[in-house]
Amino acid sequence: MLTLQDKEDSLMKLNSKRIDFEYTPSEEIFTFSEDTGLPFLFDVDEELTDNPSAMDAVGEMLDEAETLAEKAKAAIKAALSDQGAPYHDLVTFFMQFHRDDVGSDIAADLFPGTDPAKLSFIEMVDFLRLKRFGSLVDYKMDQQVFIMDLSFNPEITDELMVIYFDLKKEIFCITHES
């Protein structure tokens, strides 16, 4: 049985310029903002934490989380602009729900300083915030992927735009979850 000292001896340091973070190999990472200083939740599946190259990729992607969030927002805007885009209907539904279906008081809270009824769906994308960033193994692809949750305001709505990135920092899937 592992003692506390054994666990402390087995701690690994995440290779990140952004945060000073230690983790235990083979244990899931799930942290809140107050634990890391990051402005979002951070999580990594346990099967990745004992793989140094996978964790190096986590550190690199974590250092670029906001840049990747901007890339995700650009992809959402592109999907909104092109009715033939694969995710057009999905992202349109997400935007329509938050502007037209939540009620005017909630919409006003989601989009402060605006008249939500006059906002275009593309303008709404700029209000999305990074809520969570993590990494897991996609069993269909049999590879490590990165997952990002974007939300208008997690204290008001639990609806998310979930963006999946591959190891090359390319988006391969956009979903809507709650």
Where are each of the predicted segments found?
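Long, contiguous N-terminal structural blocks used for assembly/anchoring
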Residues: 1-113
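Compact soluble domain cores
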Residues: 91-141
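Acidic, proline/glycine-rich low-complexity IDRs
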Residues: 2-29, 122-178
